[in-house]
Amino acid sequence: MSALLTHRLALLAKAPHLPLLNQCLHGIERECLRVDAHGHLAMTPHPIALGSALTHPQITTDYSEALLEFITGTDQDPRNTLAELEAIHRFTYAKLGDEYLWSPSMPCPLPSEADIPIAEYGSSNIGRLKHVYRQGLALRYGKTMQCIAGIHYNFSLPEALWPVLQADDGDTRTERDYRSARYIGLIRNFRRYSWLLMYLFGASPALDAGFLRGRPHQLEALDADTLYLPYATSLRMSDLGYQNNAQAGLTPCYDDLSSYTESLYRAVSTPYAPYEAMGIKDAAGNWQQLNTNVLQIENEYYSNIRPKRVTATGERPLQALRARGIQYIEVRCLDINPFLPLGIDLAESRFLDAFLLFCALADSPCLADGECGAATDNFLKVVKEGRRPGLQLQRCGEAVPLGEWAGQLLDEIAEVAALLDRSHGDSRHAEALAEQRAKVADSSLTPSARVLEQLRTNGESFSQFAMRQTLAHADYFRSQAPSADELQQFETAARQSLERQAAMEATDTLDFDSFVADYQRSLSL
């Protein structure tokens, strides 16, 4: 373990500082497709009983009208975060009728591209902007890729911790700039080590054969309806034969916040010739993308982790980051575990806390020449063949066996987990870490291996397995209907969200073309 990490852990172990570690904040976003009783994509509108997808704080849609997204608030205790996520699931199932929530990350058998419904958000300008943005995604990348679901894990260190660390570092920057620099350091370490998360939690080694729509690929056929790779952990996070040339040069190496925001600003303000050839509007004059830039908006940039700041009404993410710095990070590379009703559990959450705190406290120099590329290569190697016996990764220009490096990382993360346990007065982070050690010792315990074992043992296709898990989880949630109080709270939130959407639609005065022009201009102000 580095001297710096040892020093920082000793600092935080002191009596005045140790309780601060209880104040890390967590939030979870879980996406899932609505499907019918046959395991096919639901072609119905977003259920009105769930409220407005535009304005509801907890239940919205992602790309497709059928791709639900559940959003928890933030809490210091991940048990509360998961309890809130479960309550959202139970309410949703109380209103879903004969539809279901698809269990894994990779989608059910999909209809033709043209028939995948894009999410609708009503007639307000902001609602139309969200819809046109999604039309642009369809135009640029196709609809099929947008139907993949995942878990997003939001995490922040306690605000009171930053002055302690800054004073210890002897750093003279403003607290805002110091905090942002340290979060960027966390992100650099995440880039170095996130392959470990793919090995431990990747759960998409197989997919429905129709997903690739006849594109060339390097996958193997498990049966007539299933494609897979024998040692894959997360095909969701691989390229799957899809290339994104526009974003190819966009991977920032996260030297500092200003270089990150500058890179993103260039992407949302620089035209890209192939998109210019498509045009903003189609031949009939209908909007088909917001603009012809490399990115229509900041969130189009596809990354495994994002620096984040809560935005004010009408404020864009870049403006918020520039004005007030980084507030938290969003981990975006986590597969949904199809063996878990929520797709994530407490053990995973507690390990993520220890892992992310390790990334924040460990030494994190800027990624040197070649290190940025090596981090990307390691990640892609693990998602495609992470369970291959003897697999080697690149570390500091040298080959190292995955198992050896994973063991060394877990030894260091164990010290962070022990500190978290001292702060909480229990041993739950150490127990979560022990579960991950077992997976490194025996790859058959990983979710990806367990998925393939189920397919082979039961002679099931991917979609048959997925529907079996979907039905089991539906039974779980429907057997625990919301209490009368919960039902009333969710129904009130749904009704209020519909009222907010109606009010927005009634008060819009600007025409949509002018609204989009103002939105584009807002970044240069």
Swiss-Prot record:
Q: Tell whether DNA damage is among the UniProt keywords.
A: no
Q: Which SUPFAM superfamilies match?
A: Glutamine synthetase/guanido kinase (SSF55931)
What Pfam families does this protein map onto?
Glu_cys_ligase
Superkingdom in the source lineage: Bacteria
- Show the InterPro entries listed in the entry: Gln_synth/guanido_kin_cat_dom, Glu_cys_ligase, Glut_cys_ligase
The intrachain disulfides are none
Q: Which GO terms describe its biological process?
A: glutathione biosynthetic process
Molecular function terms from GO: ATP binding; glutamate-cysteine ligase activity; metal ion binding
Catalysed reaction per UniProt?
A: L-cysteine + L-glutamate + ATP = gamma-L-glutamyl-L-cysteine + ADP + phosphate + H(+)
Q: Which UniProt keywords apply?
A: ATP-binding, Glutathione biosynthesis, Ligase, Nucleotide-binding
Q: What is its EC number?
A: 6.3.2.2
Q: One Gene Ontology cellular component annotation?
A: cytosol
Pathway note: Sulfur metabolism; glutathione biosynthesis; glutathione from L-cysteine and L-glutamate: step 1/2
Gene3D superfamilies reported in the protein's UniProt record = 3.30.590.20
Enzyme class (EC, first level): ligase
Protein family: Belongs to the glutamate--cysteine ligase type 1 family. Type 1 subfamily.
Indicate what this protein is called per its UniProt record. Answer: Glutamate--cysteine ligase
Record organism: Stutzerimonas stutzeri (strain A1501) (Pseudomonas stutzeri)
